[in-house]
From Swiss-Prot:
SMART domains in the cross-refs: LA
InterPro entries: La_dom_prot (IPR045180), La_HTH (IPR006630), WH-like_DNA-bd_sf (IPR036388), WH_DNA-bd_sf (IPR036390)
UniProt modified residues of type Phosphoserine: 33
Gene disruption: observed consequences: Impaired abscisic acid- (ABA)-, salicylic acid- (SA)- and jasmonic acid- (MeJA)-induced leaf senescence in detached leaves.
Region (Disordered): 1-52, 95-313, 474-523
UniProt name for this protein: La-related protein 1C
Record-level Gene Ontology MF annotations: mRNA binding
UniProt domain HTH La-type RNA-binding: residue ranges: 363-452
GO cellular component: cytoplasm; plasma membrane
Superkingdom of origin organism: Eukaryota
The organism's taxonomic lineage, starting at the top: Eukaryota, Viridiplantae, Streptophyta, Embryophyta, Tracheophyta
Location within or outside the cell: Cytoplasm
Length: 523
């Protein structure tokens, strides 16, 4: 679309901004249009502001026939002054009829059509319209600082190219409410592509007309004569004034360009097609993304989209655990002093140590001594010893008893003890010997070991022998008492060996010689 803009200088010169450069001359702008025949247009709003007295009926007659859709019933609008409301209704109907006629017969693109679709009649009579006599006089302070007058700016509205006619066509409810006239814009902001798009214009016109008739809401003028705008039902983020091509009228009749630019920056991007590029390069970057329509759909509804970058919520910072002081030790539980009563207990009496009494020592006889005595004497009267011990058998009487003094005088018994009473106690329960008084003998078979004596031989020799034995025993007892106080004696009487039968016979025939040792023991 940039090439179309550069190749059509005539169309760019016909933009509303170019018209403001011609000081509002409608004839000059029409003469420059090569596509449509020139036709002078007299705007009804120009007559209203100037105070011309052209009748509204003549304006309605010149407008020509319109389509049946333009004859929709419209509620009359209450005027500011005492003027009849029919004039305003007729003016609105004429404007609506011109718009519908252009929508139906706008297929011929011979030339650009004026806004109000009728030539201006210079010979029209000038008369007061809509109670102009009751309007307050405009002061000099309300004039714009621009060199152009308000009348010149209103004249420039008479001839507008068809590219902006779609934006300047206003529904019934909004066209009357927005009675302001745009101030001349800067030449640098001219639309570089004013190519008309009649199909899009017709669709917007029909849509705006349908919305205006469907709503049925008519704005009421204020008491001061300025028109207020009702809230629009259009969900577009941009204002309805920019969509319809009319800026809101200031109290002074002019518009500040800086305010308009700030309004555009705050309410959305201004639709400017710079060769298919978006307006983001001009510093007007906001979160509302606009689609570029290359100048054909400049009045289309802006489309909202999701932001390019959505900042995620910052991660929550976990608090650093601070130092926790240790809990102090709880104080001790107070104990009431009145309950602390001292208790006294008597001490234990002093125990005097028990004095040691006389010591008693009991003499326990050695058990092995009895066993030793019993074993040794039992051996003397055993069969193995009596066979060879003729000496012991010689002390036996006819009944086989042997005196205890003879047995106690033996060497083995004398080493154990010399106490005859102790020997008797050791032999009380012996199964081999028998003790009767001071004599002892073999318990069984004692007659087998008694020696036979010759009656002829039993003379003084036998008596001497018995005396010698008794003497020896007496000496033994005396020696025991003198040598050993306990009763022991070192000298022991050894029994004679058992003699055989031949020896006994020889001994019976021959006298037995006693060989006494120095200690008196018989060997």
């Amino acid at each position: 679309m940039a090439s179309a803009t550069s190749n059509n200088p005539a169309s760019s010169s016909m933009s509303p901004r170019r018209i403001s450069g011609n000081h509002g001359s409608p004839t000059a702008s029409v003469a420059q249009s090569p596509r449509r025949p020139s036709r002078q247009v007299s705007s009804p709003w120009t007559q209203i502001v100037r105070g011309e007295s052209e009748p509204i009926a003549a304006a309605a007659a010149v407008a020509g026939p319109s389509s049946p859709q333009s004859r929709a019933p419209i509620e009359p609008i209450a005027s500011v002054s005492v003027a009849a409301p029919t004039a305003a209704v007729l003016t609105v109907e004429a404007a609506a009829g011109d718009e519908k006629s252009e929508a139906s017969g706008g297929q011929d693109n011979a030339g650009k059509k004026p806004v109000w679709k009728r030539p201006s009649n210079g010979a029209s009579e000038v008369g007061p319209v809509m109670g102009a006599s009751s309007w307050p006089a405009l002061s000099e302070t309300t004039k714009a600082p621009s060199n152009k007058s308000s009348s010149d700016s209103l004249k420039s509205l008479g001839d507008v190219p068809s590219s902006s006619s779609a934006s300047s066509s206003v529904p019934v409810t909004q066209g009357i409410a927005n009675a302001s006239v745009p101030a001349p814009k800067q030449a640098g902001r001219a639309n570089p592509n004013p190519t008309p798009n009649h199909s899009r214009q017709r669709s917007f016109k029909q849509r705006n007309g349908a919305s205006g008739s469907a709503n049925g809401t008519v704005s009421q003028p204020s008491a001061q004569g300025s028109f207020t705008e009702l809230p629009s039902h259009n969900p577009s983020p941009r204002g309805q004034n920019q969509k319809n091509g009319f800026a809101s009228q200031n109290h002074g009749g002019t518009e500040n360009p800086s305010q308009r630019d700030s309004y555009r920056n705050q309410n959305g991007n201004h639709h400017q097609s710079h060769g298919g590029r978006r307006n983001q390069e001009h510093g007007n970057q906001n979160w509302t993304f606009q689609r570029s329509f290359n100048g054909r759909e400049g009045n289309a509804q802006s489309q909202r989209g999701t932001p390019a970058f959505v900042r995620h919520p910052s991660p929550t910072v976990q608090p650093i655990p601070q130092f926790m002081a240790a809990q102090p030790f709880p104080s001790h539980i107070p104990f009431p002093t009145e309950l602390a009563q001292s208790s006294y207990y008597p001490r234990m009496p002093y125990m005097t140590p028990i004095p040691h009494g006389p010591q008693f020592f009991y003499h326990y006889q050695d058990p092995p001594l009895h066993m030793k005595l019993h074993k040794q004497i039992q051996y003397y009267f055993s069969d193995e010893n009596l066979i060879t011990d003729i000496y012991l058998r010689g002390f036996m009487n006819n009944e086989g008893f042997v005196p205890l003094r003879v047995v106690a005088g033996f060497k083995k018994v004398a080493e154990l003890t010399d106490n005859i009473q102790q020997i008797v106690e050791a032999l009380q329960n012996s199964p081999h010997v028998e003790v009767q008084g001071d004599f002892i003998r073999k318990r069984d078979n004692w007659q087998n070991w008694v020696l036979r004596r010759n009656p002829t031989g039993s003379g003084p020799q036998s008596v001497d022998r018995a005396d010698a034995v008794a003497k020896r025993l007496g000496n033994l007892s005396v020696d025991q008492s003198s040598a050993d106080p306990i009763g022991g004696s070192s000298s022991q009487l050894q029994p004679t060996e058992a003699l055989s039968d031949d020896q006994q016979q020889s001994s019976s025939t021959a006298p037995v010689s006693n060989h006494n040792a120095p200690d008196g023991a018989n060997r």
